[in-house]
Amino acid sequence: MQCCNQLSPHEQRLQDKIEGKVDRYRATHERVFTILESFDNTRPRIDVERAKYFTESMKATEGQPLPLRWAKALMHIAENMTVYIDDHQLICGRAGYQGRYGVLYPELDGDFLGTAIEDLPNRAESPFAITPEDARVVVEEIAPFWKGKTYHEALNLALPADVHKLTYDDPQGLMSRFIVNETSSFRSSIQWVHDYEKVLKRGFRSIKEEALEKIAALDPMSPCDNVEKRPFLEAIVIVCDAIILWAKRHAKLAAELAAKETDPTRKRELETMAEICAWVPENPARTFHEAVQAQWFTQVFSRIEQKTGTIVSNGRMDQYFWPFYEKDLAEGRITEDSALELLECMWVGMAQYVDLYISPTGGAFNEGYAHWEAVTIGGQTPEGRDATNDLTYLFLKSKREFPLHYPDLAARIHSRSPERYLWEVAETIKDGSGFPKLINDEEVVPLYVSKGATFAEALDYAVSGCTEARMPNRDTYTSGGAYINFAAALEMVLYNGKMLKYGDTDLGAHTGDPCEFKTWEEFWNAYVTQHHLFLKTAFVQQHIINNLRARHFAQPMGSSLHDLCMKHCLDLHTPQIPEGINLGYFEYMGFGTVVDSLSAIKKLVFEDKKLTMGELIEALKCNFEGKEDIQQLLKSAPCYGNNDDYADSIARDIDALSVKYGRRYSPELGMHNDVRYVPFTSHVPFGRVVSATPNGRKAWSALSDGSSASHGADVNGPTAILQSNFNSKNYGMRDRAARMLNIKFTPKCVEGEEGSQKLVSFIRTFCDLKLWHVQFNVINKETLLAAQRDPEKYRNLIVRIAGYSAYFVDLSPDLQNDLIARTGHDVM
């Protein structure tokens, strides 16, 4: 790392640590640094208590309405699971062991448990530790009950044969094909945002009272009221009691610890925690400390309730915490530093929870123990005013001074964002830990209005998950969408419905021998056929998924925090909730790979005739071994990411295929099933099944990620990448959604005030072009290579992956190499 001309602040801190120097920010963050060091280098452990008590309750309630069963299971968990208060902590509440931990959701994919438990400690992607006793409990007490009852098994049996063969590689559906990949069986719901403000202003006792009033108002003679509404409302009452009980158990523990504590400062801290946990989240928060604790209890209990995507978002934290912060600051109850310490106590709590995927597919899609509790800052108020405040800047300061990979900070940008805000965003990006990612109001808000939201609702969106956005109390869609490997669709054109990875198995449409195609139009039409087949497969999956989910999942706590669920007495997993907006999606994987491949075929085979189709296919089959001249020729074709209309027009045509298909068939599903370009880390396992491609990519290597250019193809600078993203979008069509865009700068590129100003201008350009998302790595390639050689020295190196940041050494070698291969821009 010392060979680099310029280090980012994050790299410099790592270098200082290697040299034995004390972090210069430690003195002002001593508490959270101490907590972090207690767990940071440990392998996550599996905690089985949630699964054990959930299973015990579900055994005892078979035959009852599902929302009631779920609420009773949550009460059983709240009564029995171990509660912890960590040393030095000021915020309490966790869903499992002390240290880094993950929990199990056997109702989801418990059919994997019997075989997966012994493999988890040794798998390449995100391994977990488990004690022998916990492994025994899983295999002997938990897994047997769920055999034949899991959501994954139901989905596997429900898929038609033609859909199944593109989805799974075995009859039981235990292994993915990585072609048209369902994602609903390794998460109960997609990413979500609760209405935390409701908890802070009302408390769960008020929500319980609302449910009791609705029960009292039911028509005792109405079949609907008795069979549908009453069980839902009774579940709300139970779950409110459950989270209140769980919080009071923490209050009791804090009081017990305080009674034994000899250090007077820590004793008072524990007494304060006991008082706070006895009050919230049952009652409205009165102070900033109470607000932070109430929010954290809500978020952790939501994790206990179900597996929500990769996590439940924190929403617009600088907005709903602001009144408490402003009041306490004015009354002298807190200082900026003490408020920051409370928030960072929450941050280290987030870092200890680790998302656990039992299935190999889930683990491969979410490497680096991925979960991203997005904290949204900035943007606009529901009235359309700029929303930045002092808390906004405090969150940015925290990211620069305490570079933890949680929370996932997301900065909303709009055309009137203040210069100071953009400057501090730029300074935080320059720090080099990958924060914040940027989301553009100028794209998101009009798009959501076009889909039925009011301006106030759209303006109040919060970032959720990788790059997605949600509107609390208006969004109602929870089903995971398909990840579609369109590079596989291209390969099926080249091999007439087959893929080299899968031998003679017929997977796609028989579009004919491409060597017999005389024109580009013939080849394009063959690609369209395969593309549409993949989309049809995804939409059939989604239709089945939508109809299955309410039979397998309920979400009483999440429903209690949604206005429409409470109004209509419907669980959040109900397929159609009146007045709700169903924002679904499918993911396009390998966009840059496919665009550049089609560009090369069109230009070199059909227009310039520098290559025959036969010569191309021969070079692809041998993975360019001995055909390096052809590989270089293919790489010389026009490429996406360079503001080149030849390639970008193909990209726009491909995007239109997906958007138009979604527009035509989404109404049949009762939803907006929109195209997104958000791969998480799936572009790596998807690449492992795709042979060499006509853009010069070698077989089995990673595909391009999101809406980014193929690695090494973007040679005209970062602004050209923004322009290509703009060129490739069909702005006149609303059936589109998130696009993830990764850009890597060297620290030298953004050095000093001049570098900050260039970055601010770059952000303004991103905003003006109405792109959805962009995120940055500011790092030297040499640092990444050094971390590969000596991972222990670089244990704390944080990098930006796919809508989230993670420790570089927690990634598989394939994903590490993918990050290294991304173009690092020296000039802007």
Swiss-Prot record:
Gene designation per UniProt: iseG
UniProt keywords, alphabetically: Lyase, Organic radical, Pyruvate, Transferase
Domain PFL: 30-698
Gene Ontology CC annotation, any one: cytosol
Positions of the catalytic residues: 466, 468
CDD domains found in the cross-reference section: PFL2_DhaB_BssA
A GO BP annotation: alkanesulfonate catabolic process
Organism taxonomic ancestry: Bacteria, Pseudomonadati, Thermodesulfobacteriota, Desulfovibrionia, Desulfovibrionales
Protein name listed in UniProt: Isethionate sulfite-lyase
Keyword Lyase belongs to the record: yes
Record-linked InterPro entries: Form_AcTrfase_GR_CS, Gly_radical, GRE, PFL_dom
Described function: Involved in an anaerobic respiration pathway that converts the sulfonate isethionate (2-hydroxyethanesulfonate) to ammonia, acetate and sulfide. Catalyzes the radical-mediated C-S bond cleavage of isethionate (2-hydroxyethanesulfonate) to form sulfite and acetaldehyde. Shows no activity with taurine or ethanolamine as substrates.
